A protein has these predicted regions:
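Amphipathic alpha-helical segments used for helix-helix packing
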Residues: 72-76, 87-109
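Amphipathic alpha-helical packing segments from all-alpha helical-bundle domains
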Residues: 57, 105-132, 141-144, 171
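Hydrophobic alpha-helical connector segments
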Residues: 61-88, 143-146
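Amphipathic C-terminal alpha-helical segment
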Residues: 84-87, 105, 127, 147-164, ...
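Generic hydrophobic, amphipathic alpha-helix propensity
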Residues: 1-5, 22, 48-52, 56, ...
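Short hydrophobic clusters on alpha-helical segments that form packing/core surfaces
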Residues: 1-9, 81, 150
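All-alpha amphipathic helical-bundle segments outside canonical DNA-binding/catalytic cores
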Residues: 72-75, 112-113, 131-147, 156, ...
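Helix-turn-helix
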Residues: 4-43, 47
Length: 180
């Protein structure tokens, strides 16, 4: 149910997905949904965001553990995103910005769930940078730049229907890392 609802929320946005659409896609009754999520659709969204958080951070951690430096790991993540976009035409497993922009100002619990994911990703980046010899202060700043650059490039790729923004940061981010 969470995987199906996550895809619906990512494709259409929270407000555009009706409860009946979720029930039909998941082939469950309203009672079953409310049994698992007594607070309804918003509680389901938060569960979807938590699941997405786990999947994304597990993948990023895996990639970062496979590469010796932040520069190599960052390049590998960006290349994976480019491949996903070129192969599948989507980045749905990696971004949830549409949900953030739609819901963050309306629901504190959704904003908190979204914020947790961004914090975890930034923490993964920061830890790798510190392991590479960056000071804590520099690692915090550079990890924020990395997160904002990658997330922004993903949004631009989707709106432009092009992988060029990710390809651009694939070139520029390693240069930024070298300059520190």
């Amino acid at each position: 149910m969470i995987d199906i609802a996550t895809k619906l929320f990512q494709q259409k946005g929270y407000k555009s997905v009706g409860l009946n659409e979720i029930l039909k896609a998941c082939t469950i009754s309203k009672g079953a949904l409310y049994h698992h999520f007594p607070n309804g659709k918003e509680e389901l969204l938060i569960a979807c965001l938590q699941s997405l958080n786990e999947a994304i951070t597990t993948d990023i951690e895996s990639i970062f553990h496979q590469h010796e430096t932040t520069q190599e790991a960052t390049t590998a993540i960006i290349e994976k995103l480019i491949t996903n976009l070129e192969t599948d035409g989507t980045l749905s497993g990696y971004t949830f910005s549409s949900i953030v922009s739609e819901m963050a100002s309306l629901s504190e619990s959704v904003r908190t769930a979204c914020g947790s994911l961004y914090e975890k990703i930034q923490e993964i980046y920061r830890n790798k940078l510190v392991a590479d010899g960056f000071s804590n202060e520099s690692a915090s700043s550079v990890s924020l730049l990395m997160l904002a650059s990658i997330e922004g490039a993903m949004m631009l790729c989707l709106t432009q229907k092009s992988t060029d923004p990710l390809k651009t940061i694939a070139i520029l981010l390693p240069n930024v890392l070298k300059s520190y």
